[in-house]
Amino acid sequence: MRDAQEGRTGRIRVVARVRPLIREDVELPEATAHARSGSREECVAVDERRASILLRKPFYDAREFVLDSVLGRDATQSETYEVVARGVVDAVLQGYNGTIRAYGQTGTGKTHTIYGPLAYWRRGSQPQLELSGIITRAAMQIFAYAE
């Protein structure tokens, strides 16, 4: 596949999107113990400029991962689409193959990123473009191209 935005051929790009903390995260015993210890360090530190993620856990060595792109906790669905999918869909429209894959642990936001919030898909719900995931946005881009 040729990435129209970066001019690369046949390359797999790795992008991480770090989701915001949810209620369950804060209620975990480890989170409570971490807060009691007085440590204010985040266990997942995001550096979007360097496209890196630093993982910290008490009593373990920190691990840094440098990727092609990193989207922080405040990344919108639109920003995510622009970074992750627009170039792939552009290449597909030019006749190349393209795949977008969401991978990760349960509860990390894959479904939200790909489809949008589950409430968005309930029967009778009003569509809200700003909440749309990658699939809806890709379909819209393809249909706009076809017109």
Which residues are covered by each model-predicted region?
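P-loop NTPase motor catalytic core
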Residues: 40, 49-147
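Long, basic/Gly/Ser/Thr-rich N-terminal segments
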Residues: 1-55, 60
